[in-house]
């Protein structure tokens, strides 16, 4: 479904590669964990998968198409990397704005279901600026899920959550995986979180998979 081949990234001004010759395949319905320390290259890899950064060399293909060759290749993706919501807009308005921005207004009817799934329906008219970190994480997750993507990229979704919050998020993702055969790449510092959720996991260190 998604194939990464010999992917490398060297940022301007650096004399080292932040990502070096990374290759990875993720099949349909597979949940793959990505574990590594800060600075290991997790976010760099995910940002290139999300097209917010371009690789120095190598390719990423989705369903046989190079993601950097067309504008709409990631149409079926749900991405949770950097904050994607507006703190001064209500949760409901954030989801509507996201869907309108991406031309997916047909998913408006899915907003209630998604917010109930992440346990934010009762807070739908509140603004994220006053939320706890965990609620902000779930707001970002709702945006990633609302259009029922076929592929999820989640960078450190468990950071800042207490054990109950972590388990709730794991349960949500498991539910989505069982309901629809969606593929996921999820990064974390904690192996235990990934073991509870993923089919397999890979280690990244110094920009390389080990």
Task: Identify the residue ranges that each predicted region occupies.
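Catalytic Walker B motif of ABC-type/P-loop ATPase nucleotide-binding domains
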Residues: 152-156
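A short, flexible loop at the N-terminus of ABC-type nucleotide-binding domains that lies
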Residues: 1-4, 8-21, 28
């Amino acid at each position: 479904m998604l194939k990464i081949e010999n992917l490398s990234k060297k940022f301007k001004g650096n004399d080292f590669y932040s990502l070096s010759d990374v290759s990875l395949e993720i099949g349909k319905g597979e949940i793959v964990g990505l574990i590594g320390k800060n600075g290991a290259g997790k976010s760099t890899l995910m940002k290139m998968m999300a097209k917010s950064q371009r690789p120095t060399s190598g390719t990423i293909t989705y369903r046989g198409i190079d993601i950097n060759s067309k504008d709409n290749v990631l149409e079926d993706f749900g991405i949770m990397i950097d904050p994607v919501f507006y703190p001064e807009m209500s949760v409901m308005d954030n989801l509507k704005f996201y869907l309108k921005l991406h031309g997916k207004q047909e998913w408006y009817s899915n907003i209630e279901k998604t917010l109930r799934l992440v346990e934010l329906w009762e807070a739908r008219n509140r603004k994220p600026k006053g939320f706890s970190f965990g609620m902000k994480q779930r707001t970002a997750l709702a945006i990633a899920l609302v259009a029922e993507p076929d592929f999820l990229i989640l960078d450190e979704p468990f950071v800042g959550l207490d054990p109950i919050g972590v388990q709730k998020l794991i349960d949500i993702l498991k539910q989505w995986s069982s309901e629809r055969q969606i593929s996921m790449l999820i990064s974390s510092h904690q192996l235990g979180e990934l073991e509870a959720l993923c089919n397999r996991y890979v280690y990244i260190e110094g920009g390389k998979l080990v």
